[in-house]
Structure formats: C-alpha cells, structure tokens
C-alpha cells in the first residue's frame, strides 16, 4: 500500500484537529478550516455512531504517527500481548519508533521528514546506521545524525523549531553534536491528552 502524499490539510480536516503533519514554520494555513470536513459536503459533519467515533480515533492516531493500516494492526496485536493497559502499550510502541524519536529530538521538523532522514541513512543508533523507520528505540539508546549529514540546513532549522516549541522530557539532546539519548519510554501521562486510546481498544475488541 502506498503512503499518502496528498495535502496535509485534508487529513487534519478529516479528523477535525491539527495532526501536526506540517512543520512549525509552515503551520496549517488560515484557509485550512479544520472544523470543516473535506469534500463538497464538508459543511455537514454528520453525527458519528460509536463505531464511527472509534474508527476516526484510530485513523487520527495512525495519521499522527504516519503508520500504515497493516503496521498499525501489528502494533495493536503486540500491545495486546504485553502486560499492562493495551492502549498505553500501543502509544508507547508508536513513541519508540525511530522516526518518531528523531522527530522528538528535533532532528526533523515533522515525522515525515524524520522518516526520510532515517530512510536515507542519515541517522545512527548507538553508533550504527539504521535505516528502518519502525526500528524500536530502547531506553538508554543514543540516537544521532551521521557526521556527514550534520551540516544539512533542514536539520539546523528543525532543531531551532524544536527549541521554540519545547522538547519532551524523555529525550536529552546535544544540539551542537546533533546527538541525543532516549532516556526512558514515556508514561501515558507524558503523552497527548487529545488521544483517546480506549476508543481504539474498543474498536479492535469487536
């Protein structure tokens, strides 16, 4: 299945919220009315059934992290097989993806750009080049930009944007060396309250 490459605004309008798919330097334009669904009948956001609400929440989270349907289903199965709350396990698995960690550290301005950095072999984990965006980063891992890629302007700009919005507490970054430590897997309380993972659990439990 191909990855979506269309307008980012359309996805945010579909979910009715900013999915942070664009960098801070190119935030959603004023003309992108996220309160209005896309399409010719966009003015009518119909009332959703319980199933529809659950499905929309799954799609929202899937799009935030840039994960395809089959991948997302695999993450859910892995989360359900682990001890603890399935929904929290799911979010933690998504947060530990290498492309997401690169984004959290500020090396990429968006998760899509961070995924590209990983795929283009611009990122190392514990000194070894890793080009798999879904690679699971573990607590204590050192994630860095490869030396030959450190002078890229987009990385410097991404780090500046990250410094402006504030970096998450579970990573520690040396912006000059373009290297960081994934200190720990974030707890549910550390993550966005705008996500209702219980709806996703209900959807997959049907």
Swiss-Prot record:
Keywords, alphabetical: Ribonucleoprotein, Ribosomal protein, RNA-binding, rRNA-binding
Residues of the S4 RNA-binding domain: 96-157
CDD domains the UniProt entry points to: S4
Subunit structure and binding partners: Part of the 30S ribosomal subunit. Contacts protein S5. The interaction surface between S4 and S5 is involved in control of translational fidelity.
Organism of derivation: Stutzerimonas stutzeri (strain A1501)
A GO term, aspect molecular function: rRNA binding
Family the entry assigns: Belongs to the universal ribosomal protein uS4 family.
Gene Ontology cellular component list: small ribosomal subunit
GO BP field: ribosomal small subunit biogenesis; translation
Gene name as annotated: rpsD
UniProt protein name: Small ribosomal subunit protein uS4
């Amino acid at each position: 299945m191909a990855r979506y490459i269309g307008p980012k605004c359309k996805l945010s309008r579909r979910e009715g919220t900013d999915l942070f798919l664009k960098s801070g330097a190119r935030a959603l334009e004023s003309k992108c009315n996220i309160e209005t669904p896309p399409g010719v009948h966009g003015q009518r956001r119909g009332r959703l059934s319980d199933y529809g609400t659950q499905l929309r929440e799954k799609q929202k989270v899937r799009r935030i992290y840039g994960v395809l349907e089959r991948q997302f289903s695999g993450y859910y199965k892995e989360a359900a097989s682990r001890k603890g709350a399935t929904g929290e396990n799911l979010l933690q698995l998504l947060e530990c993806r290498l492309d997401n960690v690169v984004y959290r550290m500020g090396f990429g301005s968006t998760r899509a750009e961070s995924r590209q950095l990983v795929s283009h072999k611009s990122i190392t984990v514990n000194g070894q080049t890793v080009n798999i965006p879904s690679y699971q980063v573990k607590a204590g891992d050192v994630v860095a930009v490869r030396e030959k890629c450190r002078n890229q302007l987009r990385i410097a700009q991404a780090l500046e944007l990250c410094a402006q919005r504030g970096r998450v507490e579970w990573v520690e970054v040396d912006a000059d060396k373009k290297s960081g430590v994934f200190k720990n897997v974030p707890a549910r309380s550390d993550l966005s309250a705008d996500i209702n993972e219980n709806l996703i659990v209900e959807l997959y439990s049907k």
